[in-house]
C-alpha cells in the first residue's frame, strides 16, 4: 500500500488538498496532508522563531507516524515552497521515501534558501520582485500578510480555479512566517539517490517538459541528473493551483507518478571507448 504525504506552500495548509486527497483515497491510497507550523489551522502557533527546520520537523513527524509495516511506500509531494521542508524531511528519512514529487515547485539546492534561489535564478519581473520584497512587507519583522483577494486575482496564476475555490482560498489563507524562506536548506547525497517526479503547471508557468529537455540537451550541469531513468515528468495544462483547478487530474497524475509512470528525459551524456593508439 502507498501513502501520500502532501505538503502545501505558503499561506495555506492541509485543507488545500481536500479534493485531491478524496480522489487518492477512492483509489485505495493512504493520504496524509501536512499543515506546517504557523499556517492553516496551526496559524495560532506562529511566531518569530519559526524557521525551515521547524517545517522540516513537521513533515518528518508525519512520515514517522506512518507505520512502515502497514504502509512501506511513502510518496512525498512538495508543492511550491512546500518542496523545501519536503526535501529536508526526505534527507532525514530517505529510507522511507519511495518517490519525491516536485509539484510546480523550485528544485532546492544545497546551501541555498528559497530567497537565494529566487534572487539568483528567477527571471526578472513582477513575480520575482514580489517574492524578494516579502521580508520588507513582514509585520513585526516576521509575519508576511496573506494576499488580498485582489492580489490573488492579479498575481496568483489562478487559471482554471473557480470563483468558489478562489473564495475558499481567500477565506482560509493565513499569514506566513518569514523565517523559513530565508534559511538555507541542507541536502545530502541521500536525496539525490531518490526516484523523483516533476509536475509542471504549464498555463502561465515558466517551465514544461520540452523546455527542460532543451536545457538538458544544452549540457547545463545543474539539470543533467534529471535525465536519470528514475526521474519522470508530467505537464498539466492548468495554472499554479492544480489541486483547486483540476483535482481529479492531479490525483491521477500522482497515482501514475507513484507507479513510476511519466515522461523520461534523454541523456546527452555519451560514453566513448578509446584504446591504445596504433
Model-inferred region functions:
Residues 5-11, 35, 79:
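The conserved beta1-alpha1 loop
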Residues 11-19, 31:
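Serine-hydrolase catalytic-loop signature spanning alpha/beta hydrolases and amidase-signature enzymes
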Residues 21, 25-44:
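Conserved alpha/beta-hydrolase
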Residues 38-74, 91-92, 115-123:
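Active-site loop/oxyanion-hole signature of alpha/beta-hydrolase fold enzymes
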Residues 72-114:
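Conserved hydrolase catalytic core segment
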Residues 91, 101-142, 180, 207, ...:
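Flexible "cap/lid" loop of the alpha/beta hydrolase fold
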Residues 174-237:
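Conserved serine/cysteine hydrolase catalytic core
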Residues 228-278:
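Catalytic active-site module of serine/aspartate enzymes centered on a nucleophile-bearing elbow/loop
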Amino acid at each position: 500500500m502507498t501513502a501520500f504525504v502532501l505538503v502545501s506552500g505558503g499561506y495555506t495548509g492541509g485543507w488545500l488538498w481536500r479534493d485531491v486527497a478524496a480522489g487518492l483515497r477512492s483509489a485505495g491510497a493512504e493520504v496524509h496532508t501536512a499543515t506546517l507550523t504557523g499556517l492553516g489551522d496551526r496559524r495560532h502557533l506562529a511566531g518569530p522563531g519559526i524557521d525551515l527546520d521547524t517545517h522540516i520537523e513537521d513533515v518528518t513527524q508525519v512520515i514517522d507516524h506512518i507505520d512502515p509495516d502497514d504502509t512501506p511506500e511513502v510518496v512525498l509531494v512538495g508543492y511550491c515552497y512546500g518542496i523545501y521542508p519536503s526535501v529536508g524531511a526526505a534527507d532525514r528519512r530517505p529510507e522511507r521515501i519511495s518517490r519525491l514529487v516536485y509539484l510546480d515547485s523550485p528544485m532546492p539546492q544545497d546551501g541555498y534558501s528559497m530567497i537565494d534561489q529566487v534572487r539568483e535564478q528567477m527571471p526578472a519581473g513582477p513575480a520575482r520582485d514580489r517574492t524578494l520584497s516579502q521580508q520588507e512587507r513582514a509585520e513585526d519583522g516576521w509575519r508576511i500578510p496573506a494576499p488580498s483577494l485582489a492580489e490573488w486575482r492579479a498575481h496568483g496564476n489562478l487559471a482554471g480555479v473557480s470563483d468558489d475555490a478562489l473564495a475558499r482560498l481567500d477565506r482560509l489563507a493565513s499569514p506566513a512566517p518569514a523565517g523559513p524562506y530565508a534559511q538555507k536548506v541542507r541536502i545530502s547525497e541521500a536525496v539525490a539517490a531518490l526516484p523523483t517526479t516533476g509536475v509542471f503547471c504549464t498555463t502561465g508557468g515558466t517551465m514544461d517538459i520540452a523546455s527542460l529537455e532543451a536545457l538538458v540537451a544544452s549540457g547545463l550541469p545543474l539539470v543533467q541528473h534529471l535525465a536519470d531513468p528514475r526521474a519522470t515528468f508530467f505537464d498539466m495544462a492548468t495554472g499554479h493551483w492544480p489541486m483547486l483547478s483540476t483535482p481529479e487530474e492531479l490525483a491521477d497524475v500522482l497515482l501514475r507518478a507513484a507507479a513510476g509512470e511519466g515522461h523520461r528525459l534523454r541523456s546527452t551524456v555519451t560514453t566513448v571507448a578509446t584504446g591504445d593508439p596504433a
